[in-house]
Swiss-Prot record:
UniProt similarity note: Belongs to the HY2 family.
Keywords for the protein's UniProt record, in alphabetical order: Oxidoreductase
Entry EC number(s): 1.3.7.5
Matches recorded under Gene3D superfamilies: 3.40.1500.20
The protein's enzyme class: oxidoreductase
This protein's name: Phycocyanobilin:ferredoxin oxidoreductase
Taxonomic classification: Bacteria, Bacillati, Cyanobacteriota, Cyanophyceae, Oscillatoriophycideae
Protein's UniProt keywords contain Oxidoreductase: yes
Organism: Rippkaea orientalis (strain PCC 8801 / RF-1)
Amino acid sequence: MLDTSPVSIRSQLNPLICQLAEVILSHWQEYLSLSLYKLPDGLGYVEGKLEGERLVIENRCYQAPQFRKMHLELAKVGKGLDILHCVMFPNPDYSLPMFGCDIVANSRAVSAAIADLSPANAELTLSPTYQKALSQLPSLDFRESRDLPEWGDIFSEYCLFIRPTNAEEETQFINRVADFLKIHCQLAVQSQPVSVEQETLNLAGQKYYCTKQQQNDKTRRVLEKAFGQEWADKYITQVLFDLPY
């Protein structure tokens, strides 16, 4: 049974982050056979200082037959920055995309919200099964779309990257993340292990995704300021975007 009780900082975070964390955990529990994933020692809960402000990072990690690692990170910097970060890393013996979701906010507003099912193959395309399921979702209209980073070729055409401007748009974003999760979990459970040759290709695709994500300078700068370069490198490469095998 997955423990979905609030972590100690969740109630202190922006309401959208609180709601989304619950949506993610509840979908994992409903659809997947979960077990705990062991993080490197000392990296499950971390406290530090960033420009005089208290920084707290809390991580939850699980695994399932189809996913080698399912990571949910919640972070808070003083009273001015709340963060949710989530990635579902497939087991390479299943040909599945990468689910990812991030929110950057403060107590009053959300500055960025992104969610995607990103292809993890050499062609950088989703499978026909995923294409069909995602294409049937209703289109959404948001006032403020955000530009993807320069390294953003890993994202799919269904990627949602916005700044929600009101409660209605926040609800639309949560509902779309729930759509992504339901599709992803259901198709993952229905999927079958692949050949050794395809597993090698899946590994390469996942490594490409992780290598691109490690180029996120904003994340690195925050971690280096709070904990130093060596610790930041370790956290990024062993917790946020560890390379399989």
